[in-house]
């Protein structure tokens, strides 16, 4: 917890605004403390990293929408549930959105190149820039990206293999 929050006593009623931010989990909330213009982001946003979106409870479409929703609020900092305090909140939010969309495009391009492929082969191809020890966790995010691409009608799953619909 950042020094701005340590030792502070607050009456929660009417001072903290809950913001439903599904994506990491369906029941995830961020909390906005208007008085100090700080967003308590829980597991929604972290400094220097992205959070895991693990289906079935996590959903990439909802996650990206929730990130965009935060642009409608006014705050100067983010206190994440893990990691460092964030003093450039809207830059980090935009970076996170772009990172997710770029990863999604990488998934789609690999599918277009590889054709119908199982998730494990796709995982190695898409997350070739990730420490191999992290691949089991990356697989959850890959699955979330694939579900989003299916929801967006860009990919189909047939007989255990994913295929681009935009070949």
Task: Please provide the spans of the model-predicted regions.
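Single conserved hydrophobic/aromatic residue that forms the stacking wall/gate
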Residues: 1-12
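Generic leucine side-chain signal with a strong bias for well-ordered alpha-helical environments
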Residues: 5, 67-70, 111, 146
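C-terminal regulatory/interaction regions
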Residues: 109-167
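Hydrophobic residues embedded in beta-strands of well-ordered beta-sheets
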Residues: 16, 37-39, 155, 162-163
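Metallo-beta-lactamase
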Residues: 17-106
């Amino acid at each position: 917890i950042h020094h701005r929050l340590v030792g502070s006593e607050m009456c929660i009623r009417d001072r903290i605004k809950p913001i439903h931010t599904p994506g990491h989990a369906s029941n995830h909330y961020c909390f906005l403390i208007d008085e100090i213009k700080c967003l308590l982001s829980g597991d929604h946003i972290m400094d220097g990293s992205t959070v895991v979106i693990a289906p079935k409870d996590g959903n990439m479409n909802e996650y990206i929408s929730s990130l965009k929703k935060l642009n409608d609020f006014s705050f100067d900092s983010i206190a994440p549930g893990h990691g460092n305090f964030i003093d450039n909140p809207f830059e980090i939010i935009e970076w996170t959105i772009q990172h997710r969309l770029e990863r999604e495009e990488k998934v789609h391009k690999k599918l277009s190149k590889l054709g119908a492929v199982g998730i494990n082969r796709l995982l190695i191809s898409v997350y070739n820039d990730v420490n191999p020890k992290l691949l089991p966790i990356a697989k959850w995010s890959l699955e979330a990206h694939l579900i989003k691409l299916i929801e967006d009608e860009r990919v189909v799953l047939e007989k255990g293999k994913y295929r681009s619909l935009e070949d």
